[in-house]
């Protein structure tokens, strides 16, 4: 059972939602895969008729909840944890419409985690229980603890999509969350409790969403205070990395959001898409390169570096189109660039799926100077559409961008390193044969979920085989 706090079919706050929509489907040809997700208002609005099929009992301060079930049009079964009090509210899965975290997030996601453990134990009345729990990030991580603390033996795999989000709560909540007093230390994190740490300690296996990120988080620079624990798990062979895939809908030959389609052997559609992007962002017609930024506008994503090098890009004849939202200070910096360079820099603060896809389909380069990147999906979307990533060599960007072949990498998250990389990109743009060869290589790079799915199937079997109970996946 795939346990997750967001799923792009219904509601999405980040790349986790895309993974949750794609990975279970990539595995269904082999196993009976089902998904458990909270019953947010957006989920219920899109789910249609929900059949009540089970119920989980209250635990400490965690309320009892009904379990609903729907089946997607492609046959994927979805269990929905129903609680009007906890989940039916405005906002994203994690924050209110004002942008602040919900004060009861600990109760909300502990309830989700406990429900997963109860389903695994066969105590939810479903007439079915999974042979393995696949838990995703801190909102679901505590399920591994609830399984172990109740004497359960269901194998648990925990996937860390972003180690920076750890689900921190005060020690005073331990009793309310139903954590046994003798197990509280498993969650200890510098004077607080961490849901994610509890999952890392209790899961049978931990994986991250790229091979390089799995290595990086075992060191202090990227370990977010959990590096020693993760290094210990890695030493026992219980920490691995699998690069995410992207959905098959990202196909420039058929994409529903594109008016002008193209293929690896037929480029003309890219020019039409570029013209559309320039018009949408108020950019002048130009024969120079078009740089896209499709990102949250936050420090982690290196947006401050982009703002620093923007004058160089414009001076060299390039244009920049930015879509995204995030930290107010960076949003203001981007807005100032549009005022300083009208017709050369344009921005859309917010997000619109169709516009983002057209940017990938029309831009020449994608700017992605992330300070850290567990996997990253934008670089793979860009490659699929012939847009070459210019990326900081970190995490999944190392694993997915072949420097000088399918994009460009720079080694240090600094303005000077990014400037030197931009010079390489401009030189490539002035060599049409090289630019075409790189675009072709990028578009042909294998990045579908079939590759990642096979690796997850092997990891499921390994996790089940090495769990204490020696359970087997059906």
UniProtKB/Swiss-Prot annotation:
Q: Which EC number(s) are documented for this chain? A: 2.4.1.21
Transmembrane intervals = none
Keyword annotations for this protein, in alphabetical order, are: Glycogen biosynthesis, Glycosyltransferase, Transferase
This enzyme catalyses: [(1->4)-alpha-D-glucosyl](n) + ADP-alpha-D-glucose = [(1->4)-alpha-D-glucosyl](n+1) + ADP + H(+)
Pathway assignment reads: Glycan biosynthesis; glycogen biosynthesis
Molecular function terms in GO for this entry? alpha-1,4-glucan glucosyltransferase (ADP-glucose donor) activity; alpha-1,4-glucan glucosyltransferase (UDP-glucose donor) activity
Question: Which top class of enzyme applies to this chain?
Answer: transferase
What processes in GO biological process is this protein linked to? glycogen biosynthetic process
Q: Which residues bind ADP-alpha-D-glucose?
A: 12
Superkingdom field? Bacteria
Against CDD domains, the record matches this protein to: GT5_Glycogen_synthase_DULL1-like
Q: What family does this belong to?
A: Belongs to the glycosyltransferase 1 family. Bacterial/plant glycogen synthase subfamily.
Q: Which PANTHER family match?
A: GLYCOGEN SYNTHASE, GRANULE-BOUND STARCH SYNTHASE 1, CHLOROPLASTIC/AMYLOPLASTIC
Query: What does the record give as the function of this protein?
Result: Synthesizes alpha-1,4-glucan chains using ADP-glucose.
Protein name per UniProt? Glycogen synthase
What is the scientific name of the source organism? Xanthomonas axonopodis pv. citri (strain 306)
């Amino acid at each position: 059972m795939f346990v997750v706090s967001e799923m792009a079919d219904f509601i999405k706050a980040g790349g986790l939602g895309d993974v949750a929509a794609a990975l279970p489907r990539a595995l269904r040809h082999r196993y009976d895969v089902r998904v458990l997700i909270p019953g947010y208002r957006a989920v219920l609005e899109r789910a249609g008729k929900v059949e009540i099929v089970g119920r989980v009992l209250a635990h400490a301060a965690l309320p009892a909840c009904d379990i609903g079930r729907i089946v997607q049009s492609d046959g994927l079964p979805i269990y929905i944890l129903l609680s009007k009090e906890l989940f039916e509210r405005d906002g994203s899965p994690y924050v209110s419409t004002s942008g602040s975290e919900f004060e009861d997030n600990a109760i909300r996601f502990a309830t989700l985690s406990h429900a997963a453990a109860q389903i695994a134990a066969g105590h939810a009345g479903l007439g079915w229980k999974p042979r393995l729990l696949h838990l995703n990030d801190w909102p679901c991580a505590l399920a591994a603890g609830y399984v172990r603390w109740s004497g359960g033996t269901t194998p648990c795999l925990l996937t860390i999509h972003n180690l920076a989000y750890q689900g921190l709560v005060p020690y005073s909540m331990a009793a309310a969350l139903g954590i046994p007093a003798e197990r509280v230390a498993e969650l200890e994190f510098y004077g607080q409790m961490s849901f994610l740490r509890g999952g890392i300690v209790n899961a049978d296996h931990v994986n991250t969403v790229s091979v390089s990120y799995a290595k990086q988080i075992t060191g202090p620079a990227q370990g977010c205070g959990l590096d020693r624990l993760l290094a210990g798990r890695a030493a026992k062979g219980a920490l691995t990395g699998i690069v995410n895939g992207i959905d098959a809908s990202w196909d420039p030959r058929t994409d529903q959001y594109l008016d002008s389609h193209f293929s690896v052997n037929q480029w003309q559609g890219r020019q039409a898409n570029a013209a559309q992007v320039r018009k949408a962002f108020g950019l002048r017609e130009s024969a120079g390169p078009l740089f896209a930024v499709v990102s949250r506008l936050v420090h982690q994503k290196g947006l401050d570096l982009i703002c620093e090098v923007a004058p160089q890009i414009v001076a060299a004849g390039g244009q920049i189109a930015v879509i995204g939202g995030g930290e107010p200070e960076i949003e203001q910096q981007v807005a100032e660039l549009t005022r300083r360079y009208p017709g050369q820099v344009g921005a859309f603060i917010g997000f619109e799926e169709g516009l983002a896809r057209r940017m990938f389909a029309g831009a020449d380069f994608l700017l992605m100077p992330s300070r850290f990147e567990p996997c990253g999906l934008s670089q793979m979307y860009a490659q699929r559409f012939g847009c070459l990533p210019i990326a900081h060599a970190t995490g999944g960007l190392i694993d997915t961008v072949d420097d000088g072949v399918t994009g460009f990498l720079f080694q240090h998250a600094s303005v000077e390193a990014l400037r030197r990389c931009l010079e390489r990109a401009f030189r490539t743009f002035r060599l049409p044969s090289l630019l075409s060869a790189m675009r072709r290589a990028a578009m042909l790079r294998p990045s579908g979920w079939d590759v990642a799915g096979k690796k997850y199937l092997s990891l499921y079997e390994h996790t089940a085989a090495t769990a204490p109970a020696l359970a087997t996946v059906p």
